[in-house]
Amino acid sequence: LNDFDRWPADIDGEGSGFLMAMARTITFGRNGMVLVEASPGFEIDDPRWEDNKSSLHQGPPATGIVSLYNQGDRRRWYWQCPSCQESFEPHRSLLRWGNSEDIKTAAESAHLACPHCGHIIVEEGDRFGEGKFELNKKGRWLRDGQKWLPDGSIVGEGVVSDSASFWLFGIAAAFSDWKSLVTKYLNAEKDFAATADTTSMQGVLTTGFGEVFCSKSALSSRLPEDLKARAKDGGERVV
């Protein structure tokens, strides 16, 4: 079921497209399968939802694809830092860029910072470490409750479910690049600061970064403060 969150919630009074598809797999027994994919299309109302979540990988209380994800074993994509070997999710919160007021210049400096040691990861890779392509080749899906240790072993009791569910954020997506993501994000921030219209930001966060949108969260974080908190001077790198 392609782009599931753009489907009607109820089809001719027979329920969701997912439930209808599941019903049609019954005759295939254990071989029956339904594949659903989408970027999150339904907004959430509570900007503090993470305060009440029961597990690390649990998604927000949203309908559509996120609800199906939460019903499964909640797998997330992880990278291993080239410097400290600790694992982490490549997420927008780790994305950094220069403090230039020119959006193009700022976006060209986009990079990721390891949440454990601060190691700078450049998308194309450089002499200081591997880039997105290499990290994706070595990446792993972890079920909710599992942990990837520096020695390569995976520990922890992962969630067990009849459904395998996966959430990949846009930072690791093969056909998206960080410069474009940052450009779109900063332009959306600029539009929001000028108009208080969240339409552009919602599109960037959902289809670009693969996140669920919360307008109340956006309204609580104005442009100047957000950019000052996120922008960092790249400076000179050291080995």
Can you describe what each PLM-predicted range is?
Residues L1-V239:
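Short, flexible loop motifs at catalytic/binding sites
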